[in-house]
């Protein structure tokens, strides 16, 4: 079931918890003359998280050399509080080799299936996608009135205040089971080129990332001394994975799950295998993992103490009731007989 309004498409998946298929496709919808559909993995695409992708519908029927550049924003709607909705965004070039793109780790299944979490109401999951087509190479799926919808420049996107690609949304190079950033659902893909970028120690990064990356090289100048890849696209993609990993580790232990830490450990191994010197980050990740263990152990102790306190309060309440009864009995026993009682 789906509903299209302007550039937004709403997909309501009924009886989500009872879905048996590995993956589900939404109805097809049109945005700027291009035909799309959503792809979801209800039980996760190799991870314990909802996996969600935007796909070009009918890509097998498009002519050779077709390409589409699109920005899109996903939102898994929390039906109890919109502020708790899970949102992710990215942009990517779609072509014959990359007909879908999105997020393997959109939302943890534990949080999704929480009966009081607000994501599943009456068995329904609601997903909203907002798509903006930036450029089209090859024919459109439907005729449009204006040539402007055939080719949209990136500058037009910026004029409409569409968000720039962020660190978290460009983690495109990681393996599917090691990454929670934007990626194709079925293979390792090269990150889309970024038109506006700056060089920091041989890495092309976004202007918003310059300060952070510069700080990393200042504190760890040998971080890339043995780094293998020379291609700028690959180097940028690895840097985005590193920045996203650091951002993940900066979250509170309450926000981090064991799955998150497992993914972080896998991502770290992936980066070190490429030649990045990250011994310092490995130590910090161990500290974060230890803090998570301490938090969980502390939560367990708190729960145990709360239960013990509850039992003690109940026992105290019972003792107080028994005390009042005993006092009443003593009061009765102390009362003297009257003349009438005796005579």
UniProtKB/Swiss-Prot annotation:
Note whether Metal-binding occurs among the keywords: no
Q: Does the keyword Coiled coil apply?
A: yes
Record's protein name? MATH domain and coiled-coil domain-containing protein At3g58270
Against SUPFAM superfamilies, the record matches this protein to: TRAF domain-like
The record's annotation in SMART domains points to: MATH
- Region Disordered: start-end pairs: 156-193
* Record-linked Pfam families: MATH_2 (PF22486), PEARLI-4 (PF05278)
Bias (Basic and acidic residues): 168-178
Q: Where is the composition biased (Acidic residues)?
A: 156-167
PANTHER family xrefs: MATH DOMAIN-CONTAINING PROTEIN, TRAF-LIKE SUPERFAMILY PROTEIN
Q: What are the MATH domain coordinates in residue numbering?
A: 6-131
Write out the entry's keywords from A to Z: Coiled coil
Q: According to the lineage, what is the superkingdom?
A: Eukaryota
Q: Which residues form a coiled coil?
A: 271-335
């Amino acid at each position: 079931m789906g509903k299209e309004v302007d550039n937004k498409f709403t997909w309501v998946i009924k009886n989500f918890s009872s879905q048996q298929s590995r993956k589900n496709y939404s109805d097809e919808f049109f945005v700027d003359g291009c035909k799309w559909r959503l792809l979801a993995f209800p039980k996760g695409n190799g991870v314990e998280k909802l996996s969600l992708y935007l796909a070009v519908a009918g890509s097998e029927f498009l002519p050779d050399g077709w390409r589409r550049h699109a920005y899109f924003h996903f939102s898994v709607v929390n039906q109890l509080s919109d502020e708790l909705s899970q949102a992710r965004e990215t942009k990517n070039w779609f072509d014959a080799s990359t007909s879908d793109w999105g997020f393997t780790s959109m939302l943890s299944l534990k949080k999704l299936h929480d009966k009081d979490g607000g994501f599943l109401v009456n068995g329904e999951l609601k997903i909203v996608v907002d798509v903006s087509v930036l450029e089209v190479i090859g024919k459109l799926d439907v005729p449009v009135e204006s040539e402007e919808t055939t080719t949209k420049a990136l500058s037009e996107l910026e004029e409409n205040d569409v968000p720039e690609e962020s660190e978290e949304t460009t983690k495109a190079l990681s393996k599917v089971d090691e990454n929670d950033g934007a990626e194709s659902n079925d293979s390792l893909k090269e990150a889309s080129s970024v038109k506006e970028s700056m060089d920091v120690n041989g890495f092309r990064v976004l202007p918003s990332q310059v300060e952070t990356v510069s700080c990393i090289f200042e504190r760890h100048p040998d971080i890339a001394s043995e780094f293998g890849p020379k291609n700028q696209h690959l180097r940028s993609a690895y840097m985005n994975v590193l920045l996203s990993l650091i951002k993940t580790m900066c979250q509170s232990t309450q926000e981090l799950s064991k799955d998150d830490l497992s993914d972080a450990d896998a991502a770290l191994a992936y980066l070190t295998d490429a030649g990045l010197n990250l011994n310092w980050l490995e130590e910090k990740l161990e500290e974060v993992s230890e803090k998570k263990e301490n938090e969980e152990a502390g939560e367990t102790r708190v729960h145990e103490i709360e239960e013990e306190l509850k039992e003690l309060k109940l026992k105290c309440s019972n003792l107080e009731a028994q005390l009042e009864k005993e006092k009443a009995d003593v009061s009765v026993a102390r009362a003297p007989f009257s003349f009438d009682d005796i005579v």
